[in-house]
UniProtKB/Swiss-Prot annotation:
UniProt keyword terms in alphabetical order: ATP-binding, Cytoplasm, DNA replication, DNA-binding, Lipid-binding, Nucleotide-binding
Domain comment (free text): Domain I is involved in oligomerization and binding regulators, domain II is flexibile and of varying length in different bacteria, domain III forms the AAA+ region, while domain IV binds dsDNA.
Lineage per the UniProt record: Bacteria, Pseudomonadati, Pseudomonadota, Gammaproteobacteria, Oceanospirillales
CDD domains according to UniProt: AAA, Bac_DnaA_C
Gene Ontology MF annotations: ATP binding; ATP hydrolysis activity; DNA replication origin binding; lipid binding
Region called Domain III, AAA+ region, residue ranges: 159-375
GO-annotated cellular components: cytoplasm; plasma membrane
The protein's name: Chromosomal replication initiator protein DnaA
GO BP, one annotated term: regulation of DNA replication
SUPFAM superfamilies membership: P-loop containing nucleoside triphosphate hydrolases (SSF52540), TrpR-like (SSF48295)
Keyword match RNA-binding: no
Function: Plays an essential role in the initiation and regulation of chromosomal replication. ATP-DnaA binds to the origin of replication (oriC) to initiate formation of the DNA replication initiation complex once per cell cycle. Binds the DnaA box (a 9 base pair repeat at the origin) and separates the double-stranded (ds)DNA. Forms a right-handed helical filament on oriC DNA; dsDNA binds to the exterior of the filament while single-stranded (ss)DNA is stabiized in the filament's interior.
Length: 495
């Protein structure tokens, strides 16, 4: 009875939450009837359980009270899974997906942003792990001189940047989950979130968080062997080891680390021998309880040129997306960087830069460095006018890239309507809502005035544009769909 009530509750939660929130936190929960009018919700791991308990349990209880004909069931939120139980499947989510029961030596896969549930066939069979256990090392060929060269090139160098710590990382809505997951890994390495897979565009903080975890682990234990490297360095080390007939030294080095942090894993694409070696390294580290953190510019399943068995393993722990920072976070980043540089940056100046530079943190910091340098060399205070002059080339390039016409075409394509209809006088919701969204985007992404934006949308009055902007802001707060649409369009226009 309680499970049926949970299915109704899911329908409301799906309407109220964004698709990212629902798929990440609610959809993975498995429901079963407990004793004495109890509803047991089973989370795949402690991280999901704690997050749901803090953020969503209150709303779940409210919905159950509203939906129950009598006394609402008491919710028991625990970590666990059942054999052959169907995952929660509200309307419009398709047929129920059977939960995969994995060998105890493998961590349960945590939910991933935008990730579809995996089929049983995605996981490697037990024989692969058995073969790894039984595999004997091939005797090494080659002389002692070559051996010294390879061991020297693979000596423990962490590669960590001491400036990248949790304390210097600016948290916001766009990276809150990634930071929380990284902190959990730093406190409990080799646990349920192994590997931790962070993905997102360039300059969003993936590398910073990876270093922050590494620095924390290295600081906890004096002899901790924490290694950070780019995926291409892993490939280069393997190639050198093969050339010197010392592949066993390569294997011993990478399989003896306490934590292995590999950046830009997508560069393994097309490198079959490197993928083969990393596959076995991955298995060895996982079985040894050694932590792995991987980053990529895209979701694991979307990395082309990488074997399916590797992509499947990338999702065995926790997969988290990092989004471009929202305005408030961009301002906070600028203020923190200015404080670190001991520069007096007025808040309105930081706000102005943050409004203009939206794509990623790297470009944001680059713009601030230029403004600070120009201010220092010219002996002038940092004001909005000064920033406008200092960054005029960058701002002109951005305006050229994100013009009103580009916004109009992108919005029309996104909503699958004709551009002519978007600019017409038609007032049907299927056209009016995209038009309002396009106007709001034009106000946020360009330097055009409201009258100029109105002219570009079929000669409309500036008050119409102002109304559209206010309407979209309200809709973003009330509607998960509009909020998701707006975020997707921002990404399309600024990436």
């Amino acid at each position: 009875m309680s499970v049926a009530l949970w299915q109704q509750c899911l329908n409301f939660l799906q309407d109220e939450l964004s698709s990212q929130q629902f798929n990440t936190w609610i959809r993975p929960l498995q429901a079963e009837d407990g004793d004495a009018n109890e509803l047991c919700l089973l989370a795949p791991n402690r991280f999901v359980r704690d997050w749901v308990n803090d953020k969503y349990l209150k709303r779940i209880n409210e919905l159950l009270r509203d939906l129950a004909s009598g006394k609402p069931p008491k919710v028991q939120l625990t970590v666990g899974s059942r054999r052959n139980v169907a995952m929660s499947s509200p309307r419009d989510l398709g047929a129920p997906v059977s939960a995969t029961t994995m060998n105890a030596s493998r961590p349960t896969e945590a939910p991933a942003v935008h990730a579809a549930p995996r089929a049983k066939g995605d996981y490697a069979d037990e024989q692969e792990i058995d073969r790894l256990r039984e595999r004997e090392e091939t005797p090494r060929r080659g002389g002692g001189e070559r051996q010294v060269q390879v061991e020297g090139s693979l000596k423990h160098q962490s590669g960590l940047n001491p400036n990248f710590t949790f304390e210097t990382f600016v948290e916001g809505k766009s990276n809150q989950l990634a930071r929380a997951a990284s902190r959990q890994v730093a406190e409990n390495p080799g646990g349920a979130y192994n590997p931790l897979f962070l993905y997102g565009g360039v300059g969003l903080g993936k590398t910073h968080l990876m270093h922050a975890v590494g620095n924390h682990l290295a600081g906890q234990r004096e002899n901790a062997k924490v290694v950070y490297l780019h995926s291409e360095r892993f490939v280069a080390d393997m190639v050198k080891a093969l050339q010197l007939n010392a592949i066993n030294d390569f294997k011993r080095f990478y399989r003896s680390v306490d934590a292995l942090l590999i950046d830009d894993i997508q560069f393994f694409a097309g490198k079959e021998r490197s993928q083969e070696e990393f596959f076995h390294t991955f298995n060895a580290l996982l079985e040894g309880g050694q932590q792995m953190i991987l980053t990529s510019d895209r979701y694991p399943k979307e990395i082309s040129g990488v074997e399916e068995r590797l992509k499947s393993r990338f999702g065995w722990g926790l997969t988290v997306a990092i989004e471009p920072p929202e305005l408030e976070t961009r301002v906070a980043i600028l203020m923190k960087k200015a404080d670190q540089a001991k520069v007096d940056l007025p808040h309105d100046a930081a706000f102005f830069i943050a409004q203009k530079i939206r794509s990623n943190v790297r470009e944001l910091e680059g713009a601030l460095k230029k403004v600070i340098a120009d201010s220092h060399f010219m002996g002038k205070p940092i004001t909005q006018d000064f920033i406008r002059e200092s960054l005029k080339d960058l701002l002109a390039l951005q305006d050229k890239q994100v013009g009103v016409d580009n916004i109009q075409r992108t919005v029309a394509e996104y909503y699958k309507i004709k551009l002519a209809d978007l600019l017409s006088k038609r007032r049907s919701r299927s056209v009016a809502r995209p038009r309002q969204v396009a106007m709001a985007l034009a106000k946020e992404l360009t330097n055009h005035s409201l009258p100029e934006i109105g002219d570009a949308f079929g000669g409309r009055d500036h008050t119409t544009v102002l109304h559209a902007c206010r309407k979209v802001q309200t809709l973003k707060e009330e509607s998960a769909d509009i909020r998701e649409d707006y975020k997707n369009l921002l990404r399309l226009l600024t990436s």
